Amino acid sequence: MTYPKIGIRPTIDGRWGGVRESLEAQTMGMATAAKALIEENLHYPDGTPVQCVLSPTTIGGGAEAAKCAEYFAGENVVATLTVTPCWCYGSETFDMDPHTIKAVWGFNGTERPGAVYLAAVMAAYAQKGLPAFSIYGHDVQDMTDKEIPADVAEKILRFAHAAAAVGWMKNKAYVNLGGIAMGIAGSFCNAEMFQKYFGIRAEWVDMTEIVRRITLGIYDHDEFNKALSWVKANCKEGFDCNAGKDLPEIIRKSKVVDPDKDWAFITKMTMIMRDILYGNPKLDEMGWHEEALGKNAIAGGFQGQRNWTDWLPNADFTEAIMASSFDWNGKKAPTPFATENDTLNGVAMMLGTLVSGTAPCFHDVRTYWSPEACQRVTGMAPTGVAKDGFIHLINSGATALDGTGACRNAKGEPCMKPFWEMTDADIKACLNATDWCRANYEYFRGGGFSSHFRFHFPRPLHTVFLFQR
């Protein structure tokens, strides 16, 4: 693929005859330092280091700004970082492309007025209606200081990471597998929102497509055998809440897949949903050319309830493995994949994954426990971080297995890692921390399995919500 790149624009005072010449090395030094900072610290969602493009020349006026823009146009530059230690000619040197994301780093030094250019160019951007981010260091630096201060580095990396995420999602698709689940407002896919705010196309695939592919064998049969063997070896079964229940006939006769064949069916479901999103060259070899293409997805969701789950195994395993940073093929990029096709949750998961590099965990906000309620029910009052009460987030069965926190960082603390840092030991630990319980037939007549695990703490968590009006 052609990766979305960050363009570095070194702007300079254009006065030849001593001024410009004295600034060339420092200005280009800032640009190369920023380029190295980004490329050494940031990754695309597929694990590849983020790529930067350096302007072929410092930019002292409109002619060089145009030359830089022309060069960037052929490099798939989605964002620009303008850097300077000095005064430059505001609107003559700025990035005027309305389609790029912009930031400006003005050097905090006394010898040259980098701050003046930063203020002037930000004013120019505001007057032109072009959003831009201002980056300036807290402390004055010596002109000869080639180090990027920590506070500036953090701002540059935040900007570049978010900009690369925007470039990554552009022109990709959110794939709705099914429609609206149980009247959930978030399941109403707003195609205009996806296009206008995220540059993403919305696509719909009826859930019968999964049945068609299972029936006609439109999946990689060798991979299926590998995947099913992996599932049986690594996905231990937990408790069965249906045991001993006298279930009504309407529930008993609704399960059309034999319980002993649930895992095989679910494994096929998982492979097929992945293939729908991303395509699979193996299908092309099998003669299924259209199916091999996929949907160029960046995220998706599965309706499930109730048109599917009232008679077929649920997709909790599918959703959990899609969102996890590993499967039977080893470590992989996690897929933001929304339970109940809650598209707003799907977008929140996507944004979180793009800027963190880690798997998205889909939880239910189940209860709020006040200190008084804890005291009444358990006889004990919460202490420490929970002393004022806490919100109970529960894994309803479809959360990424990374959410167990079974991975460990260099200090031995529970954590979640970008998939490219996952080890075989991390993967095994997540699998060992999880068991798979039979779905409650009163809710899921078609059966299936739901993940069950306890979180490892302490570790930081970030909660993401998305609302649309």
Residues covered by each model-derived region:
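An N-terminal assembly and electron-transfer interface module characteristic of large anaerobic redox
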Residues: 1-469
